[in-house]
Amino acid sequence: MKIVILYRSVLKMKYCLIIIVVLLMNVTALYAQDPHFSQFFEAPLLRNPSLAGLFAGDIRIQGVYRNQWGSVTTPYQTGSFNIEYKQPIGKANDFITTGLQILYDRAGTTNFTTTNIYPAVNYHKALNGEKSRYLSLGFMGGYVQKRIDRSKMTTNSQYGPNGYNPALPDGETFTKSSYHYWDGSFGMSYNSSINGSETDNFFIGFAYHHFNRPLNSFYKNPPVELNPKWVASAGVRFTASEVSYITIQGDYSKQGNYTETIAGATYSVKIGDDYQNPLYTLHLGGYLRVKDAFIPFLKLDYRPFSIGFSYDANISQLKTASQGRGGFELSISYAGFLDRGNTTKDAVVCPKF
């Protein structure tokens, strides 16, 4: 009987080790890398602070929630909230956008939790008198806290001759279950209409995150710096018909040895009698995170509100363990005018992704 029990235990441990190895191949970087969203365009400040304010109106509020890997381990949960307010500068065609970005991420059985609070500012410099070309420079920086629930940790120091014993010390040398640091990012973007169109436009931008290289570890020695992250973003929107348009966009990011490429397209259909200012717009699209996931996307605009859904169909090495299931995302946003006296902002024909 003991041999049978031991054999079953070995098989169970072998299966667990396979799962762990596959996970490590895919997610080791998560504790050292930034969380990501498949609906990356619904968290513009996390892409690039200089993308703040690229919308029709003077105020925008956005929220994104992501739930990932519930079929393999404790679900990874990530939430983003941002608010932006845009206003003109003097009598010129320049604008300034101020905002706030909050990011919450919880991962793993130890509830490894990260909370980021970032004020942001973005200056939009008009490059012509028609308000059709802008160069934007943005900055974002603030406070970051990371913490774990140490009572849920399991280490090899807690295994004895009789198996796992939670009463044994975990053997880790850090004394505090949380730490914090200050973080900063900046970016630049260029956006323009296409041939003077008020609906067809494009943008390109570059951002540099964590430029101050904050210390990112529960341990004091050796010190571990958070790798800076470069992000290149681009997008174009063009008319497909009187009632529809297509948006193509993507991001490439590099942080340490980790790189990520995500890109795709959305087909948007205006619904209603007024095609210039439709009450409803339906968006259908698909995105690809290279070597990781295919992402179908659905969004409905009911001005001034929007709600979007996406789902990651896993195509990475984790596909077998996750049974192809990845992450679900829900986004909700509002974009409108807080001050009706600022309606001239709608005349800025820069991209409104």
List each language-model region with its residue ranges.
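Subset of outer-membrane beta-barrel
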Residues: Q33-F353
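Cleavable N-terminal export/targeting peptides
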Residues: M1-D34, F337-F353
